[in-house]
């Protein structure tokens, strides 16, 4: 059952209408909440309420190649980071955009659709470094496989599922791009691999995409759309959740306050309230409900329920977008209408988000047993340079520096996989209507920018390759504004360029970190909020640290495992 309608924000907890009583209330229908709603409602005697702030996806969101256009729409919360000191300097007010999904499917309806699990070491560290039993790679692999329906070939069936709801596929890459970059990376000791979600992640490969036919796969299309007829699954759209109802004496969560159609409602939970509002909003909601750093809540006159480091330890991948390869080949020179026609025929460039072609996960030691330091994303550019600037929110004064020839250029984005820097999510005020303050604190640790620079150096070392010359290709000489005081192409010049043209990837993790100690963590290994009863968090905010890649696949796994943890607790496993 789906309850639609639109809300107008009005906040009051004193006069709320009764919305009903449910066994489980799930806040947020994104990568975590969508999976949970499906799996928990498999138990017919459980009555599940899924509260979503946005509405249903439309046909526009099905096209991965148009994903960036959703960032400034009602399908996103419209967030920016706070002004950064060491990154985002070419963005308006030094504030990178930080889109977070809003609507059924959450971020899975607006992201680039890339499917990356990470390196086995990532999950083994969850156990060995962060003290979370049950989350090693071998223990979570069955949950990656459970949701997956892998269609691409070749693949190793030991590592892949073939009957799950989430379809993973590859689309044909542009031959010239593959033929150029495969041998170029091979010269640097980086081999082509068929499947980075298989035995080895490190190498250069085609991207695996959340793609079914030519349409995006989201938690809406995979886990919700075909299950709305379940009488025990209640999906309510356009709800603005303002607070979790908590019995302060017993520290028990028993319901949720929210606004719908300008009316204040209260829904009661008999078993659990599960917060799956996303990497940013879950931390915001916990703090508004009195769970968070004692001093911060006191400063905002929010009554303290539980002192926990909510909002601390925020991490995000940061990427450098300033490297462009120019070739003498024409890739795509069509109008948008012509590209949409190609899309209908299952052809590029709109088949993938950001027109991604190839990916390389690389560690500098070339050791497959060690997780990568860097991700290289190789893409053809969007249909026009102005759209490139639009995607990243680049300040007008920097537009000319990124001078893209959209028909013949190749973008190479460099992601820092494992930053040492830690940021925070804090509240601007005690009002749910105020956007949270998101500070990823990029490059606060010098080691981060040094590692990213090493990633740049590796690509620069390709510039004299005969392979490039054979394609009439070269790395574009970008004139980075405000870096003229440094010797061109010197290390300091590149460090300056990185600070100006490094951007958010919107992979918000760890603000409600999972771990064994409530002094440094918010939830335990069973995703229960410390010191609280009947309250869990299941989304990217509980990941102990960033994984080696994008975060949708790990959150799907997390929610699959969380569903079994919950079923086991109530003997319904």
Which residues are covered by each model-predicted region?
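N-terminal redox-cofactor-binding region of secreted/periplasmic oxidoreductases
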Residues: 1-573
């Amino acid at each position: 059952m789906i309850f639609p309608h639109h809300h107008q924000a009005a906040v009051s907890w004193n006069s709320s209408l009764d919305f009903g009583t449910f066994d489980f209330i799930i806040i947020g229908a994104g990568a975590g909440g969508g999976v949970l709603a499906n799996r928990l409602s498999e138990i017919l005697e459980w009555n599940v309420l899924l509260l979503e702030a946005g509405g249903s996806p439309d046909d526009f969101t099905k096209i991965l190649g148009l994903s960036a256009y959703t960032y400034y729409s009602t399908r996103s919360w419209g967030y920016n980071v706070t002004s950064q000191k060491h990154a985002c300097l070419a963005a308006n007010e030094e504030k990178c955009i930080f889109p977070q999904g809003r609507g059924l499917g959450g971020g899975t309806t607006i992201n680039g659709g890339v499917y990356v699990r990470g390196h086995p070491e990532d999950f083994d560290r969850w156990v060995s470094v962060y003290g979370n039993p049950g989350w090693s790679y071998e223990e979570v692999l069955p949950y990656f496989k459970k949701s997956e329906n892998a269609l691409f070939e070749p693949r190793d069936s030991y590592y892949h599922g073939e009957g799950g709801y989430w379809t993973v596929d590859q689309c044909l890459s542009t031959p010239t791009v593959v033929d150029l970059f495969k041998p170029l990376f091979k010269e640097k000791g980086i081999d082509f691999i068929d499947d980075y979600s298989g035995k080895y992640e490190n190498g250069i490969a085609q991207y695996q995409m959340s793609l079914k036919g030519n349409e995006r796969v989201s938690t809406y299309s995979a886990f919700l759309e075909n299950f709305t007829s379940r009488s025990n699954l209640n999906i309510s759209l356009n709800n603005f959740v303002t607070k979790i109802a908590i019995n302060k004496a017993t520290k028990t969560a028993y319901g949720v306050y929210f606004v719908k159609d300008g009316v204040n409602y209260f829904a009661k939970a008999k078993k659990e309230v599960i917060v799956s509002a996303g990497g940013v909003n879950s931390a915001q909601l916990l703090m508004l409900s009195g769970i968070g750093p004692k001093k911060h809540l006191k400063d905002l006159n929010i009554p303290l329920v539980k002192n926990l480091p909510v909002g601390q330890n925020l991490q995000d991948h940061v990427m450098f977008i300033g490297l462009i390869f120019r070739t003498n080949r024409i890739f795509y020179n069509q109008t948008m209408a012509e590209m949409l026609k190609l899309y209908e025929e299952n052809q590029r460039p709109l088949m993938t988000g950001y027109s991604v072609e190839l990916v390389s996960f690389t560690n500098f030691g070339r050791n497959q047993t060690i997780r990568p330091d860097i991700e290289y994303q190789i893409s053809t550019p969007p249909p026009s340079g102005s759209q490139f600037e639009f995607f990243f929110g680049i300040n007008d004064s920097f537009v000319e520096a990124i001078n893209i020839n959209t028909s013949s250029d190749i973008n190479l984005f460099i992601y820092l996989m494992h930053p040492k820097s830690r940021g925070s999510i804090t509240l601007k005020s005690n009002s749910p209507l105020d956007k949270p303050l998101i500070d990823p604190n990029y490059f606060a640790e010098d080691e981060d920018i040094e590692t990213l620079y090493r990633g740049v150096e590796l690509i620069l070392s390709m510039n004299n390759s005969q392979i490039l010359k054979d394609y009439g290709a070269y790395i574009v000489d970008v004139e980075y504004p405000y870096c003229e005081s440094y010797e061109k192409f010197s290390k300091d010049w590149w460090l300056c360029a990185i600070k100006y043209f490094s951007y958010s990837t919107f992979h918000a993790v760890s603000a409600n970190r999972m771990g064994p100690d409530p002094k440094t963590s918010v939830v335990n290994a069973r995703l229960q909020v410390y010191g609280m009863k009947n309250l869990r968090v299941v989304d990217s905010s509980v990941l102990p640290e960033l994984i080696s890649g994008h975060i949708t696949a790990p959150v799907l796994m997390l929610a699959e495992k969380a569903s079994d943890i919950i079923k086991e607790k109530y003997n319904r496993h």
